[in-house]
């Protein structure tokens, strides 16, 4: 870790680290560990309007210089006074990032560290096999005393064999580092909830402990509470079982350890899934036999219909959901879409959220990491905003709706179906269960899950039908891409199949029961190398509208449909996804592409207040102080979710740095020559309107660590962080040691 004992020097502008030296900006200005950074910022003021003067060709507005705009396509149009290099050198200093790497493993066909000629290549793309160090106290405190008064420990199940500390005073003196002085030394969790779930391990414990003297003269250390701040439904300070110590105030969908243990030992029965899967195997064999016969399609369909057997189970009536222009959607984001980040976005106006994608098989195996992804904050289990202007389902009850849904993926129908039954049984606060059919990363794709399902429409349909049958009242949705390959787009046929069912079986099977489809306007092959294709999304939106109308006619001409297989009264919602970076993008897509709503992904990580802009219908030029306040909130929300002890605090630090790896890419609109901003435009080297704004734009990850230290205290000596997606600047830093 770099020393902070350095002389004060001006912060270099964004990009200068690559052009001049590799010394981080925060090494050139001393930052204290105070809750508010010592960098002073001038209050935000309206920009003075210059008096009209004769303009030279170079001074004309960019709208009048289309040729210049074309020459600089892909480069953020930053005003000349903020550039630190001549305009002719702008393209050379523009930051290059790899958002494909941020999603997971390598892109299709990526080679290893050595090229075809055997020579070692320069590192680029994703940092694979990243390590973050080990975060632990010097001496471990036993759970039997971690939340109890000094003289009233609980029984230690390890007895004399326990190698953890049982002496609280010794632990506080020798077993951990001293209390932190950020936030004035007061525990953010205790200040919010009136108690701290980290107990004696909290790195702010001195703010919520006291020493009491008994009549016999003995002095005892006890933890304190503030009853006025404790909510009735909050978890107890002392967990009834030490394994449930991860229960946090304001966090829902926490599955009991006993359930996860039973899953890992295969002691949980999936009665509905087992019945349905047994029927599905017979039906699939029947379909296979008929479709291999040398007959016309009509004859095959008739033969299949004649021998078709109804499934043993029917779907339960689903809770109605709603998507509209007033319900912007936060995408399920790997790594970035954690609970503290979703909480921040909901606070700023996100109306619908999803968990990070979980793998179905680890869920069925009871793995803690995947079940942790299923947790929701209390703000996510409230109803979404509902101010409809068009025709909506009259049976929709907004008071029963909620914001939070979970996303899973699977490579086999039995995994998807059993996962849906398990999630619906043990998670009481679910809006939907979303099946990811678009994840492009190699590990998922090569297993047959994610975007591999785009080329297996029959298997995908069986998954949706089965999940819908066993998920109780929870609707099932799907997220797809345009296709796997650029020259073979499959989304239109797939959307029809999800809306109506396969043409040859829909007469007997009805609709699969998919409540909504989200289409990402890219192929797997394309990834983020090109802009999202909203014209194709618009074509699919028009098809969905016709399919919804067609579903009504099919009900009239074939047979009376089972209401339980028709979520939302027979209407399938359609959501578009890709490159939404402002309210202008959002409403343009809703009004012109005719989607029900828009899902926001990277745009929300770069500027979470995009949801605030959508609600306000205008651009918001956030000051550096306001943006730093979002970083502070993330830190507080992280400690509430993961704990204020050594482990939880550095878990928060790790995900805060992941957040900053996108957050720093925001270019304030006050610095741009023209609007709207484009998310894929790369910013050249520039300086902000003040030192703090310049610091927040730094692409040096060492600066991000220093920013985290403003709110989380000094990083441990063994803490490590490497950005998930590298840029040229990161390579230079590593090359220069």
UniProtKB/Swiss-Prot annotation:
Basic and acidic residues bias locations: 1-11, 24-33, 57-82
InterPro entries recorded: Aldolase_TIM (IPR013785), DUS-like_FMN-bd (IPR035587), tRNA_hU_synthase_CS (IPR018517)
Catalytic activity: 5,6-dihydrouridine(47) in tRNA + NAD(+) = uridine(47) in tRNA + NADH + H(+); 5,6-dihydrouridine(47) in tRNA + NADP(+) = uridine(47) in tRNA + NADPH + H(+); a 5,6-dihydrouridine in mRNA + NAD(+) = a uridine in mRNA + NADH + H(+); a 5,6-dihydrouridine in mRNA + NADP(+) = a uridine in mRNA + NADPH + H(+)
Domain of life of the organism encoding this protein: Eukaryota
Residues annotated as binding FMN: 332-334, 407, 479, 520, 577-579, 601-602
GO cellular component, one term: nuclear periphery
Protein location: Cytoplasm; Nucleus
Cofactor: FMN
Region (Disordered) residue spans: 1-127
Family according to the record: Belongs to the Dus family. Dus3 subfamily.
Protein name from the UniProt record: tRNA-dihydrouridine(47) synthase [NAD(P)(+)]
Lineage: Eukaryota, Fungi, Dikarya, Ascomycota, Pezizomycotina
Gene: dus-3
């Amino acid at each position: 870790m770099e020393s902070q004992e350095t002389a004060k020097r001006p912060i270099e502008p964004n990009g200068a680290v690559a052009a001049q030296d590799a010394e981080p900006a925060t090494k050139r200005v001393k930052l204290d560990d105070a809750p508010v950074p010592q960098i002073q910022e001038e209050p935000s003021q309206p920009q003075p309007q210059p008096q009209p003067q004769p303009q030279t060709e170079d001074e004309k507005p960019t709208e009048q210089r289309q040729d210049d705009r074309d020459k600089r396509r892909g480069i953020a149009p930053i005003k000349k006074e903020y550039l630190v290099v001549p305009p002719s050198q702008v393209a050379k200093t523009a930051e290059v990032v790899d958002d494909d790497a941020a999603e997971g493993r390598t892109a299709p066909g990526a080679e290893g560290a050595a090229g075809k000629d055997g020579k070692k290549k320069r590192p680029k793309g994703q940092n694979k096999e990243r390590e973050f160090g080990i975060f632990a106290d010097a001496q471990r405190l036993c759970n039997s005393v971690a939340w109890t008064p000094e003289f009233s420990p609980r029984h230690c199940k390890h007895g004399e064999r326990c190698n953890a500390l049982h002496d609280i005073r010794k632990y506080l003196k020798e077993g951990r580092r001293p209390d932190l002085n950020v936030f004035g030394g007061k525990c953010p969790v205790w200040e919010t909830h009136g108690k701290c779930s980290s107990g004696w391990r909290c790195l702010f414990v001195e703010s919520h402990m006291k020493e009491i003297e008994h009549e016999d003269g003995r002095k005892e250390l006890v933890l304190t509470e503030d009853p006025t701040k404790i909510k009735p439904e909050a978890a107890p300070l002392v967990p009834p079982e030490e394994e449930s110590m991860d229960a946090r105030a304001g966090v829902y969908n926490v599955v009991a350890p006993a359930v996860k243990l039973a899953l890992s030992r295969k002691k949980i029965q999936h009665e509905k899934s087992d019945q349905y899967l047994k029927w599905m195997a017979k039906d699939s064999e029947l379909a296979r036999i008929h479709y291999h016969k040398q007959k016309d399609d009509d004859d095959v369909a008739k033969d299949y219909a004649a021998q078709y057997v109804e499934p043993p189970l029917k779907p339960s009536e689903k809770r109605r959901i709603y998507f509209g222009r007033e319900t912007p959607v936060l995408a399920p984001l790997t790594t970035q879409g954690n609970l503290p980040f979703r909480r921040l976005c909901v606070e700023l106006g996100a109306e619908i959220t999803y968990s990070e994608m979980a793998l179905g098989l680890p869920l069925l195996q009871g793995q803690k990491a995947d079940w942790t992804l299923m947790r929701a904050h209390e703000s996510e289990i409230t109803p979404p905003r509902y101010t409809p202007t068009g025709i909506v389902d009259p049976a929709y009850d907004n008071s029963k709706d909620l914001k939070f849904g979970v996303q899973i993926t699977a490579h086999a129908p039995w995994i998807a179906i059993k996962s849906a039954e398990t999630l619906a049984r043990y998670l009481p606060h679910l809006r939907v269960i979303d099946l990811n059919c678009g994840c492009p990363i190699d590990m998922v794709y090569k297993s047959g899950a994610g975007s591999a399902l785009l080329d297996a429409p029959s298997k995908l349909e069986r998954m949706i039908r089965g999940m819908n049958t066993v998920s109780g009242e929870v609707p099932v949705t799907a997220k797809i891409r345009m296709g796997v390959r650029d020259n073979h787009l499959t989304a239109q046929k797939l959307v029809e199949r999800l809306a109506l069912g396969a043409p040859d079986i829909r007469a007997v099977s009805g609709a699969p029961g998919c409540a909504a489809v989200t289409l990402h306007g890219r192929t797997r092959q394309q990834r983020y190398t090109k802009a999202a294709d909203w014209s194709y999304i618009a074509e699919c939106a028009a098809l969905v509208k016709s399919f919804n109308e067609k579903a009504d006619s099919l009900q009239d001409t074939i047979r009376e449909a089972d209401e339980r297989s028709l979520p939302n009264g027979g209407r399938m919602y359609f959501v578009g996804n890709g490159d939404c970076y402002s309210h202008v993008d959002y409403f343009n897509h809703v009004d012109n592409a005719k989607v029900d709503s828009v899902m926001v992904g990277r745009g929300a990580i770069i500027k979470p207040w995009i949801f605030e802009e959508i609600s306000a219908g205008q651009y918001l030029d956030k000051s550096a102080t306001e943006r730093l306040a979002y970083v502070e909130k993330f830190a507080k929300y992280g400690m509430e979710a993961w704990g204020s002890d050594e482990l939880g605090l550095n878990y928060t630090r790790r995900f805060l740095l992941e957040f900053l790896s996108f957050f720093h890419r925001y270019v304030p609109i006050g610095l741009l020559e023209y609007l709207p901003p484009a998310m894929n435009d790369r910013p050249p080297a520039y300086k902000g309107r003040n030192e703090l704004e310049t610091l927040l734009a730094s692409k040096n990850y060492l600066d991000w660590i220093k920013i985290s230290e403003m709110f989380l205290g000094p990083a441990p000596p063994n803490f490590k962080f490497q950005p998930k997606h590298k840029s040229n600047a990161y390579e230079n830093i590593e090359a220069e040691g």
